[in-house]
């Protein structure tokens, strides 16, 4: 008689914004030299990993979330399994992803899902992979994945995957607005490459439009997203949304990562709610969330064992 599995593992996968994203150069290896400040948010997806079923399976409430090997969750599972010295097929497991973080938005939803899958599947499969090895697996999957294993406010350099924890930023309410189209990371960096190669000079000159509205603090006055100008050149609506957040009281507003989502930081929840209500409508979706400290991120993304 086959023994029925007694428990599953559930974990939240928070989103992020990039408070600053400087693209400094194209590296000899083809990647980009970056200097970015990641900031974790309370908005999150939820992953539930259940043993059993027919092979390794991904299911989601969002049809835009791939269910095959192209999903970073699948790649994370394979790397974890191999890192544990295992061979052959992945264990029969169903990973259910409840998506709340939109895709192709610059909010790191897929990368956060992968980071959470590494932790959840290590627990479910009971594989002997250390925290240090898990971090290395995260870096191999991408800078955003490595960040989500840390959380809070973090500086990323080189490819964005060499991480240095920073003092947590002043807590803020965050309004996220996504237009009814996405921007792929590959496209955003490709557009930056075109401009950089055409100038054959430092990219700093193209960054003047990256800063849309600075806060009253000196630190935030230096926040710039170098991907914003080339993306806005193709999608001017993104800049209009950034400017609208500023008009509605955001102390800082910008595109997050490679877009297409934009964010605004607010001190007061009521002000943030009013801005969200005014910007949500036909062709846009808006969310209200908040920044999280490193401790809050780890509490939010802790592993939970549930009976099945």
What positions do the PLM features span?
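ATP-binding N-lobe of GHMP and related small-molecule kinases
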Residues: 1-105, 123, 127-132, 169, ...
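Solvent-exposed alpha-helices and their adjacent loops that cap or buttress functional pockets
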Residues: 2-3, 40, 139-140, 146-149, ...
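Solvent-exposed beta-strand sheet faces enriched in polar/charged residues
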Residues: 20, 50, 59-61, 96-98, ...
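Short, basic/glycine-rich phosphate-binding loops at helix/coil junctions
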Residues: 54-66, 117, 139, 213-224
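Glycine/serine-rich anion-binding loops at beta->alpha junctions
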Residues: 96-125, 143, 251-266
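Contiguous, small/hydrophobic- and glycine-enriched helical/loop subdomains that border
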Residues: 114, 118-158
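Conserved, helical-rich catalytic subdomain that frames metal- and/or nucleotide-binding sites
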Residues: 148-150, 155-252, 267-308
């Amino acid at each position: 008689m086959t023994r029925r599995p007694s428990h599953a593992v559930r974990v939240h996968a928070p989103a992020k914004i990039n408070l600053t994203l400087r693209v400094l150069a194209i590296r000899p290896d083809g990647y980009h030299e970056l200097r970015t400040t990641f900031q974790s948010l309370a908005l999150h997806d939820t992953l539930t990993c259940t043993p059993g079923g027919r092979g390794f399976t991904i299911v989601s409430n969002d049809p835009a979330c791939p269910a095959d090997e192209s999903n970073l969750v699948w790649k994370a599972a394979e790397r974890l399994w191999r890192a544990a010295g295992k061979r052959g097929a992945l264990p029969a497991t169903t990973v259910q992803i409840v998506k709340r973080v939109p895709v192709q938005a610059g909010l790191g939803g897929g990368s956060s899902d992968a980071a959470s899958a590494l932790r959840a599947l290590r627990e479910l499969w009971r594989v002997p992979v250390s925290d240090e090895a898990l971090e290395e697996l995260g870096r191999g999957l991408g800078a955003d994945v490595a960040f989500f294993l840390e959380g809070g406010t973090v500086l990323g350099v080189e490819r964005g995957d060499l991480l240095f924890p920073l003092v947590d930023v002043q807590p803020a309410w965050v309004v996220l607005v996504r237009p009814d189209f996405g921007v792929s990371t590959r496209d955003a960096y490709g557009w930056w490459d075109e401009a950089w190669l055409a100038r054959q000079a430092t990219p700093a000159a193209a960054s003047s439009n990256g800063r849309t509205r600075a806060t009253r603090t000196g630190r935030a006055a230096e926040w710039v997203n170098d991907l914003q100008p080339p993306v806005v050149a193709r999608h001017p609506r993104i800049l209009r949304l950034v400017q609208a957040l500023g008009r509605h009281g955001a102390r800082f507003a910008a595109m997050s990562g490679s877009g297409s989502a934009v964010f605004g930081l607010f001190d007061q929840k009521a002000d943030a709610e009013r801005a969200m209500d005014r910007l949500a409508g036909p062709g846009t979706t808006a969310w209200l969330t908040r920044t999280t400290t490193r401790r809050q991120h780890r509490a939010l993304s802790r592993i939970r064992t549930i009976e099945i």
